[in-house]
Amino acid sequence: MSNNNNNNNNNNNNNNNNNNNNNNNNNNDKNNNNNIDSSIKEKKLKEWFDKFDVDKDGSLDSNELKKGFKLHANIDMKDEQITKMMERADSNKNHRIEWDEFLKVASDSSSPEIEDIAEHWLQYSTKPIVHAPADVPSWKLLLSGGVAGAVSRTCTSPLERLKILNQVGHMNLEQNAPKYKGRGIIQSLKTMYTTEGFIGFFKGNGTNVIRIAPYSAIQFLSYEKYKNFLLNNNDQTHLTTYENLFVGGAAGVTSLLCTYPLDLIRSRLTVQVFGNKYNGIADTCKMIIREEGVAGLYKGLFASALGVAPYVAINFTTYENLKKTFIPKDTTPTVVQSLTFGAISGATAQTLTYPIDLIRRRLQVQGIGGKDILYNGTFDAFRKIIRDEGVLGLYNGMIPCYLKVIPAISISFCVYEVMKKILKIDSKKISYQS
């Protein structure tokens, strides 16, 4: 009985082996057929190429292409169609289509018949080409953006500091510190000068400049990388509004995560008026880690992400939509237009995200000098600010912020344009809208 079972098993194994062999043979046959079909198709395409090549010089000019389609397919191509077909297929830009260029285009047609080749080539020639900004060396873009950001932040440092002091003024972080809340812009700046001298206008700015260079670089590169990923994968020439919002938000969060400790240190140095608790970036970092742990360097990170992501998203999207609405296709905006669009987009983004920015600052600076912790997280801060200060409390320091955003954007764009000229960067290659 066992011998019979063994024989049956052997027979089954043999059958399985035979089936596997048959499958392998079938796969080999398919591969061979594909190779044969490809070879036959290429041979047929070469015949068509030779028929079109009337002067037998191994390449086709626009006249040969037009006459060939008319003679062999009875298709009367317009001159502009032939021009587009030539431009798309002519990879070496010699105004002629050589055999390898013809094969590259025609091999993707549904069949080697001339009618199908013509239809495919026409569709291929009108298919959008996505020009990635990678043509410009990354270091040029990073340098231009970094210098522009540093100069603009330095020029608007007094208003930036005034904004932060208004945001956190009620927290009484230092005894005898002057009150800025409720004062006018001019009076507040006078108080700052009287109390701290000219240097008071720029407290925390060194940290801000050090932070803004990598922040701008990472944000710019992240935006371009995410944008090009969507464009290349979806075969698009520009992003939709929703895609721009997503890409801008992702770029904002990426840059924030990489530079957040510097932003927090900058806030601590900025709100310091009389005291010398913190002496520079390194000392501030050491003291925060010693008193609050490493986690102290990331206080308010969640609130910051909630504010930065929509801010950058709205900023980029508003700017792109303004360009799309008012700038003719295939042209770049003038300096004045760029300044105007940038100011509008920055003001729009700031208005919509300012409450989150205010909460972020308060979370970053609470606990300084052993002061009480007022807020237990983002949502607790939001609730208590409305309860204690009203809805308008979410907008403390808004006017100085507006006055800072517009010149900051303007200066940034102006310096950026100068840097592009110095570094000979072609504006068309780095347009956000490819």
UniProtKB/Swiss-Prot annotation:
Ca(2+) 2 binds at D90, N92, N94, R96, E101. Residues 1-141, 225-244, 315-338, 424-434 are mitochondrial intermembrane. GO terms for cellular component: mitochondrial inner membrane; mitochondrion. This is Mitochondrial substrate carrier family protein B. The keyword Metal-binding applies. It is a multi-pass membrane protein. Residues 160-203, 266-293, 360-402 are mitochondrial matrix. Signal peptide: none annotated. Solcar repeats lie at residues 136-229, 239-325, 333-422. Residues 1-37 are annotated as: Disordered. Keywords: Calcium, Membrane, Metal-binding, Mitochondrion, Mitochondrion inner membrane, Repeat, Transmembrane, Transmembrane helix, Transport.
